[in-house]
């Protein structure tokens, strides 16, 4: 079991129960899933780029990514409906906790010119989204074998009812928010 999951059960639940005066342990917000998404718009011209992006995402997450396809045709972007244009991974359970721990302790501090993550990136329902400009911040990616530096979107979905609860949940994990 991941250390962060044990920490959540032992420390975070107690802290949030006193902070928000919950009656039951089941009311305490928890991390439900983490979604990693990599949009590869250049895949229209070269299908190999999408394979490389999927391989990077598989190395980062430890799980085979789902290839996402265009929902509708857009002439301005030269894409047709059904074209493969990206890949995504949804992490739950044990893999989610392990990735979350690696994200907080290893990957985020390796971001260039890092001054903290914005605390305003909540969606109104307690879910947090962030963008990473370079996939090379993850130690699983070998810098010498990277064909192109790509970014990815990371969404942390929680059971929190409000942004305040979601922010308190992530702050309890020492999430590096900007002061």
UniProtKB/Swiss-Prot annotation:
GO terms for molecular function: 5S rRNA binding; RNA binding; structural constituent of ribosome; tRNA binding. PROSITE patterns: RIBOSOMAL_L5 (PS00358). GO terms for biological process: cytoplasmic translation; ribosomal large subunit assembly; translation. SUPFAM superfamilies: RL5-like. GO terms for cellular component: cytoplasm; cytosol; cytosolic large ribosomal subunit. The modification N6-acetyllysine is found at residue 3. Gene3D superfamilies: 3.30.1440.10. It comes from the Bacteria. Keywords: Acetylation, Ribonucleoprotein, Ribosomal protein, RNA-binding, rRNA-binding, tRNA-binding. It holds the Pfam family Ribosomal_L5. Transmembrane segments: none annotated. InterPro entries: Ribosomal_uL5 (IPR002132), Ribosomal_uL5_bac-type (IPR020930), Ribosomal_uL5_C (IPR031309), Ribosomal_uL5_CS (IPR020929), Ribosomal_uL5_dom_sf (IPR022803), Ribosomal_uL5_N (IPR031310). The keyword rRNA-binding applies. Identified as a multicopy suppressor of the slow growth phenotype of an rsgA (yjeQ) deletion mutant. Part of the 50S ribosomal subunit; part of the 5S rRNA/L5/L18/L25 subcomplex. Contacts the 5S rRNA; cross-links to the P site tRNA. Forms a bridge to the 30S subunit in the 70S ribosome, contacting protein S13 and S19. Belongs to the universal ribosomal protein uL5 family. This is one of the proteins that bind and probably mediate the attachment of the 5S RNA into the large ribosomal subunit, where it forms part of the central protuberance. Its 5S rRNA binding is significantly enhanced in the presence of L18. This is Large ribosomal subunit protein uL5. It comes from Escherichia coli (strain K12).
